[in-house]
């Protein structure tokens, strides 16, 4: 995949509306051969994000919906770290008033981590390395949710295979935003049945 496009897509897919959207990506499966470079690039972008009130100039990360959302993000990050993941930036609630959580990158997330099983609904980007296409599909489908997936590849044939193999209702190919008023909206598994639009 074009790493620049993949990083840009990841930023859009994760941090739009602070990750508090049903179409926000939760798990980022990255091929092992480029995972270090991808992690570094995403970490640099996330470190540069400004946190604060939406009325402040240049703010990119605002508050989460409530204290429970902050606690959930903190708990998911903590569990991932206990199981062997590394926080490359962020990882904690922001000190002071409000329900702010630092934009966070968690790398080398291990199988069995809660962050891989639950919807995050917060500014936490979890990176899982994979070895080959079959490994990526297995990891991607290992969830009870299936609303949307985002695939970045330079291979049209691989993109077509992913459409058939990934258990999601929608898929963005080389884009970080999949919602479109002109396209049907819907998911699989616990993300709903059927389509709207």
For each feature predicted by the language model, list its residue ranges.
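ALDH superfamily catalytic-core signature
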Residues: 1-110, 139, 173
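Conserved C-terminal structural/oligomerization subdomain of aldehyde/semialdehyde dehydrogenase
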Residues: 1, 11, 50, 93, ...
